[in-house]
Amino acid sequence: MQPFGDAWSQRHLAGVVLAGSVLSIVGSLYMILGFFFLRECRSFRHKLILGLAVSDLLLALNFFIPSLSMVTGREISSPWNEGFCSANGFLMQLFFAQIDVWQISIALITLLMLSGPSMVLKWIRENVWAVWLFPWLVSLIAAFFAFGFWDYANVGGFCWLGSRNIRLYFNYIPRWIIILVCLVIYIAVYRLILHARRRANIQKTYRGRASDRAPPQPVTTTAPATNPESEKVNPDEISSGNGSSSLDTSRSGSSTGFTQTVHDPAVAGQIQTAAERAQEEAEQQKQVRKIAIQMISYPLAYAVLWAIPTIVMIIQVARGGEGVSIHVEGLAKMLLVFNGFVDAHVYGFNERTAMGWRQRIRPAAQEDDEEAAGTSGGVHEVVSRPEPTLKNPNVWQQNMV
């Protein structure tokens, strides 16, 4: 028996799925168009994000078509639409699995890129097509496996695996395993970034202290004898901007003449350097916190996205399909459809896509955005370089956000 089988419930769930699919379509197109129209969004990592965006778009369209049919009065689970429902369920399983593979692939390749040059990384960079092919192969295997053993049916707004038990063990639990794996990977990514920053800061601090310890070089000048008339400052020199230097020079002289030795202001230089370092350390701590938030946002977004649907599914499995209201079921369906919309935020607004669109629409804001790029670029600023590596801290120091 299909869940919420009455006509009103089916149309209500279809409307929820339709609204969510439209938002996901917009989010997916936002990422795809950003890749083709924004030069800063064409790095190697953005090529991987493009693959994820394409899968998000196809999944959103696969939600959009059946939900629109149901809203307009067509019954996708009727006997004459059995083929349509089976195709819709097969594609649903295909793209859900494909997005899972894309998520963990992007996380693993990001970690690999931050770990330094390697033959594997070199091969991946030269064979992006293989990275694109891998999620399709894995998801096709999963979809055909499900198609061979289980039936697809209307689950409320779209077709998917008909059995809740199968959906729970074949889709929900593996997705949570992937979320946990991604969490561990991005924690490792954050530790690599933090370690590289510390190494760069240590080298910079060492160079700064070495320059502070260097003995000041005296500058010896001989001031000629002067008379009181020479201490008068010419007004023309003041108006031309040379008055202050003339004033200092004339006052430094003496009526008897002497050898003047001027040392570098070591104490003032050290105070200035300490203030600059304190400000720089505070800014770096702020940037590190932003990177930490960004690292946790990747897996956390999907954990939030799948938390309620998983809880609802567990309750329904435990109670034989009952136990939640139509509104809770609608919320769970909405979150399932939100993949493209969430990815647009996590991989778009969270990185440099939003700033790129702003620069394209408002070129006058480009200078301000370039100043803010150090805190808004996120991990993209690191992995978009040709060969970021821990073995060259200077590169990290220049390129880290």
From Swiss-Prot:
Residues 38-47, 115-128, 197-294, 343-401 are cytoplasmic. Residues 239-257 have a biased composition (Low complexity). One of its GO terms (molecular function) is G protein-coupled receptor activity. The lineage of its organism: Eukaryota, Fungi, Dikarya, Ascomycota, Pezizomycotina. InterPro entries: GCR1-cAMP_receptor (IPR022343), Glucose_rcpt_Git3_N (IPR023041), GPCR_2-like_7TM (IPR017981), GPCR_GCR1_put (IPR022340), GPCR_Rhodpsn_7TM (IPR017452), GPR1_C (IPR022596). Residues 206-259, 362-401 are annotated as: Disordered. G protein-coupled receptor that senses nematode ascaroside pheromones and signals via adenylate cyclase to positively regulate trap formation for nematode capture. Its main location: membrane. It comes from Arthrobotrys oligospora (strain ATCC 24927 / CBS 115.81 / DSM 1491). The chain crosses the membrane at residues 17-37, 48-68, 94-114, 129-149, 176-196, 295-315, 322-342. GO terms for biological process: adenylate cyclase-activating G protein-coupled receptor signaling pathway; cell surface receptor signaling pathway. The gene is GPR3. Induction: Induced following nematode exposure; induction is dependent on transciption factor STE12. Interacts with ascaroside receptor GPR2; may form a functional heterodimer. Interacts with guanine nucleotide-binding protein alpha GPA2; to activate adenylate cyclase and positively regulate nematode trap formation. Pfam families: Git3 (PF11710), GPR_Gpa2_C (PF11970). Belongs to the G-protein coupled receptor 1 family. It is found in: Cell membrane. This is Ascaroside receptor GPR3. Residues 391-401 have a biased composition (Polar residues). It is a multi-pass membrane protein. Disulfide bonds join 85-159. Gene3D superfamilies: Rhodopsin 7-helix transmembrane proteins. Disruption phenotype: Decreases cAMP levels following exposure to C.elegans. Decreases trap formation following exposure to C.elegans ascarosides ascr#3 and ascr#7. Keywords: Cell membrane, Coiled coil, Disulfide bond, G-protein coupled receptor, Membrane, Receptor, Transducer, Transmembrane, Transmembrane helix.
